[in-house]
Amino acid sequence: KQPRGKYDILLSDSITDHMLGSRQLLQQLCTRLGVEPGVPRSDGRVTVDTTSCTGLCDQGPALLVNGYAVSRLSEQRIEQICQLIETATETSQWPAEFFAIEDNILRRDLLLAEETTAASPDGSALRALIDNGSDALLDTIEKSGLRGRGGAGFRTGMKWRFCKQAEADSHYVVCNADEGEPGTFKDRVLLNNYADSVFEGMTLCAGIIGAQQGYLYLRGEYRYLLDPLHARLQQRRNNGLLGQG
């Protein structure tokens, strides 16, 4: 494993960040800190490198510092970051606005429904699953015409029925939150403000297809969402909406 500095900085290398001037900011950062991209500084304090799309193209250019996202980069903000690094200021003491991530959703429409109900589902769908059974809920989902958010728009009910009918010793629910396509940030928005809906959907799916376990794949660029997601999971367990894992 390549050694990294105490401050491990990764600038987004997506085409949208390039268009917003990220390459010039990378050069400024390296020159100011006296480092070459990918090579730790001799004192071990800092490493500067690039990474794939950080999912922040709507507020780029962006970078990650020790796994935490900093958006809306400018020459001034890069200079401020360099000063904080040179004075060995812990990232917990950096200005809070550096780490502010906005969702930038102008129209929610049907994809996100009402903000209050979508962000904090009341468990009524889980009660319907328990009261009416998995077959009835699956029929409802199929009749609704609900489709996945991926480009193919595959019918959710059809996919779940295939999984339910598949012969296997165990079934699992997997939520793939890896989005690396430049300009894409839908998963970030869902996990940032609609995690309860995501977890409730996974729980419903598990009840329908007969799964006892679920997994959410979180890309490295979204590492800063991990602790809040764990907190949401624990809250759902405390509220009786999720098993103990």
Give the positions of each predicted feature.
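Feature of Fe-S/electron-transfer and energy-metabolism proteins
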Residues: K1-G245
